[in-house]
């Protein structure tokens, strides 16, 4: 019995000394999925006898407070995303307690919906029921939303939005166009990584003649087709952080030469936002590539664009179409880049999925 305060996490537990110690050991050895336990401090406290379990509303605090990084879309949400019977079918912003934006949408602490950009989107009745029910996977999931009440994608300068915008974007990619896509922490510039002329044009427009471009591959099977890698790299590719991982290219791969010219390696990541998954797989009849160049949407020396205004003023000249959405990004977050040495991973650029973890 007891209660839980959502500060960092404060648990008031009552029971036999053995039971309380077992709880502590369980937290240390089997922490909740995707959680990071920095330290457990325990002390005896004078409390009246508990007769129930409660989760107490968050309190504002001064001092150092842990902030969660953004978390790649989880397998359960992926399943719902492509389940025609699910009310979040093809919803570009599906999330739950195990995944979704965190740092990038946060205005202030503690992390509650009213202090995030999801405050712009009042929950519908169905989402509110899930949000307030401890038995659901979306209990207290701050960005929870659905097709009825959530953010919406659209093409800047066009009336196309929602499904029409996604289909138009996919068609543009397959026609050899360059697009800008707003993701979790900012915009990417994107094109078909198998289309030599499209990749060369992107390089010319961005004035990036030789530096390798990152690619996003549809799934781990596509990654295996294009690159050689071992268990350590696969864990990085498929983990909840979804960084860019530097991998050895296969000579038999289908990525065009201009992706990483005269370079034996290429930076690869897998889709980490629901919108990325929908770019690769959507119920619209478009035959889509499984390989996309996905490079930071910025001008040289500037941070990644995070708003429509940024995109229009800085990268509109680099692309033919801008796919955006109306969930505001407060904190920019570029893709983390990782490599391995002697079988151990190390970070080259620390950002999305890892920041602000110490």
Name each model-derived stretch.
Residues 1-5:
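Short, small-residue-biased leader/transition segments that mark boundaries at the very start
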Residues 6-14:
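N-terminal alpha-helical targeting/anchoring segments
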Residues 8, 20-23:
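Accessory nucleic-acid engagement/destabilization modules that flank
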Residues 14-20:
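Helix N-cap motif at beta-to-alpha junctions
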Residues 22-30:
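Short amphipathic alpha-helices in soluble, non-transmembrane regions
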Residues 32, 57-60:
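Terminal, basic amphipathic appendages of nucleotide-handling enzymes
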Residues 32-53:
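Conserved short beta-strand edge segments in small beta-sheet-based binding/regulatory domains
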Residues 59-358:
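Active-site-adjacent structural elements in enzyme catalytic cores
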């Amino acid at each position: 019995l007891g209660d839980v305060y959502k500060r960092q996490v404060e648990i008031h537990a009552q029971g036999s000394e053995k039971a309380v110690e077992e709880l502590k050991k369980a937290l240390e050895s089997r922490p909740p999925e995707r959680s990071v336990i920095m330290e457990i401090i325990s002390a005896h406290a004078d409390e009246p006898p508990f007769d129930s379990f409660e989760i107490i509303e968050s309190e504002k605090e001064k001092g150092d407070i842990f902030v969660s990084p953004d978390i790649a879309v989880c397998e359960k949400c992926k399943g719902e995303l492509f389940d025609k019977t699910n009310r979040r079918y093809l919803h570009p912003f599906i999330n739950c307690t195990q995944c979704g934006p965190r740092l990038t949408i946060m205005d202030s602490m503690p992390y509650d919906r009213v202090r995030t950009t999801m405050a712009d989107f009042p929950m519908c009745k169905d989402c509110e029921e899930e949000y307030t029910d401890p038995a659901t996977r979306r209990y207290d999931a701050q960005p929870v939303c659905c097709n009825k009440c959530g953010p919406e994608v659209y093409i800047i300068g066009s009336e196309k939005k929602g499904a029409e915008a996604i289909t138009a974007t996919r068609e543009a990619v397959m026609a050899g166009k360059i697009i800008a896509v707003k993701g979790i922490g900012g915009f990417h510039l994107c094109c078909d990584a198998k289309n030599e002329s499209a990749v060369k044009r992107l390089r010319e427009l961005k004035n990036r003649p030789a530096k390798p471009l990152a690619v996003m591959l549809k799934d781990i099977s596509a990654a295996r087709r294009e690159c050689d890698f071992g268990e350590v790299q696969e864990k990085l590719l498929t983990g909840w952080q979804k960084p860019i991982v530097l991998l050895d290219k296969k000579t038999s791969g289908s990525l065009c030469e201009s992706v990483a010219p005269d370079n034996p390696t290429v930076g690869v990541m897998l889709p980490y936002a629901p919108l990325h998954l929908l770019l690769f797989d959507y119920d619209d009849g478009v035959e889509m590539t499984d390989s996309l160049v996905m490079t930071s949407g910025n001008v040289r020396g500037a941070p990644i664009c995070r708003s429509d205004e940024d995109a229009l003023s800085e990268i509109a000249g680099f692309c033919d179409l801008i796919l955006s959405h109306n969930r505001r990004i407060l904190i920019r977050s570029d893709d983390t880049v990782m490599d391995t040495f002697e079988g151990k991973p190390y970070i080259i650029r620390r950002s999305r999925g890892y920041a602000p973890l110490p």
